Amino acid sequence: MSTEQFDPMTFALFLGALSLIPILMIVCTCFLKISMVLLITRNAIGVQQVPPNMALYGIALAATLFVMAPVFNQMQQQFSQAPADMSNMDNLKTSITNGVAPLQKFMTHNTDPDILIHLQENSVKMWPKPMSDDVSKDNLLLVIPAFVLSELQAGFKIGFLIYIPFIVIDLIVSNVLLTLGMQMVTPMTLSLPLKMLLLILINGWTRLLDGLFYSCL
């Protein structure tokens, strides 16, 4: 590729944008929600380091790639049909906008409309007049933070529902030990294996991941 085919400054900005891919992988996919739910589940069980953080993030990444595979495939097809044009900034912006359209559609579908409207109202108050006048609900500057907030909210909702049966087990074990006069026995000593047994009997991890998969569709 000769230097006549692209603008050096545009190419440099494009390379710089590639360094943001790990961050975008977190905030623009279902990775955030899946990792949150897995960490909350581990805390609800009561084991702080099993599985370790690295393993949980690996599971979350694998699950994210599984869920996002159709979206990434559509993006790959978009870029194959219309490769990034780095001749100038406007052409590059148009190419990227067209390429990330499937990802934007995914984020919009999984975004709470109320949160998106709230951020749009905030943009009118906080952004300069010319900029706020041109903003729409399809603007990535609104869609991305609205999607992140929606994923956080959904993750905590799922985590709360997961916590309930484990809290019930803790309360039952504590009351039984108190009734038997075994105050010296730590409730966690008995509740932990019961929680693990519950997960095994109901095939908990598979059901949890299935639920997360379908919640991201």
From Swiss-Prot:
Q: Which PROSITE patterns match?
A: FLIP_1, FLIP_2
Q: Which gene encodes it?
A: hrcR
Key words of the record: Cell membrane, Hypersensitive response elicitation, Membrane, Transmembrane, Transmembrane helix
Explain the purpose of this protein.
Answer: Required for the secretion of harpin.
Q: What is this protein called?
A: Harpin secretion protein HrcR
InterPro entries referenced in this protein's UniProt entry, alphabetically: T3SS_IM_P (IPR005838), T3SS_YscR-like (IPR005773)
Q: Name one GO cellular component term.
A: plasma membrane
Segments traversing the membrane: 11-31, 52-72, 158-178, 185-205
